[in-house]
Amino acid sequence: MPLFVRFLQTLNPTKQNARLRSPWPFSLLTQTASISSLKVAWRKDRLLDSAIERDKRCRVCARVVREVLNEPGHAIPLRYLEKRRERLGLPVKVKTFLSRYPNLFDLYPDRIKPKTEPVPFLRPSPRLRSFLALEASLRARHEPLVLAKLCKLLMMSRDKVIPAEKLLNVKRDFGFPNDLLTSLVPKYPHLLRLVGSPGEGKSFLELVSWNEEYAKSVIEQRADEEARLTGIRMRPNFTVRLPPGFYLKREMREWVRDWLELPYVSPYADASGLHPASPEMEKRMVGMLHEVLSLSLLKRVAVPVLGKFCEEYRFSNAFANTFTRHSGIFYVSLKGGIKTAMLREAYDQGELVDRDPLLEIRDKFVLMMEEGYNEYMQRLRTKREAMQKDLELMAKSNSELSEDESSERL
């Protein structure tokens, strides 16, 4: 039984069979409540919040590495990096950071100017350089996936054109390479074209030709796969997972039930004939947001980042309310002081289960971090053990000295 049908049964099991017979329920035609008037209270999900919190160390380390790699010669004076701590979000001094992750950088003396005294510089360590070489190899292997993501983002846009600057701003969300416009785009002139002057910030990436292989959403692919496995034609629809203890008011339950019964509207389909305030347009927008999040590395994107694409994807000004209105599909985390939209179905007990192949690069980086941190912890343990032995020896020596003094007095 499709998951959305099981969800309908939980909403109203007595009416479910009757409502499924008609894809255009009468209640939708007579419903007076507008979409925007239906409110759902936000509810904290600690497990999903913890997924964001766990990535904090990785994000900080990656920012520091990028900062050094962006410097000429991939080297920077230690004190210069210290001055950028606040901007990098580094909560400890740079020296403390380097001691915790000793395998990321090498410290060496050099002069900032020819006739000045040498000062500490840092540069990528052999271990970090080895990772960078591996990253380049993995990116080459996964280039078809990156190309597909880029084409899909363009195919969903209104005019099949997106400002290059906006795509560069989300490169880390979707796993795009830093040199996206100069390395990837020129390789595929039959699919992509850069228009304008990149240096002036007035360039646009344009879709040259439509590829039907890319014009199928994750939800449609999932329905096709279920049909292949079961031999029964499956209707594409959203996976709905209401969090434990979450309660919807009656009018909202009825609206969600009827809304789920509407035909799925692909984000790649022409929606020019849909009324902006219609439930069908709402379903298309949810499908669009679902697809964009599905294309992201971690199945989550900051809401302000998504808001920058309102014009390209025809999001309404109140698009962010969609996430809370469909709390069984999305979750909005407030961790880190920023709203982050997450796909519920991609996580299980706070762990990401729908893993993007490009996460292999991130996993290798985390492994390198853990190796360095374990080395740091081992040094601390060795130091503590040595101090403990010294204290024991001192105590033993003092005890023997006291015994000798007592013997002399006798």
Give the residues covered by each predicted segment:
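Long amphipathic alpha-helical repeat/alpha-solenoid cores
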Residues: 2-410
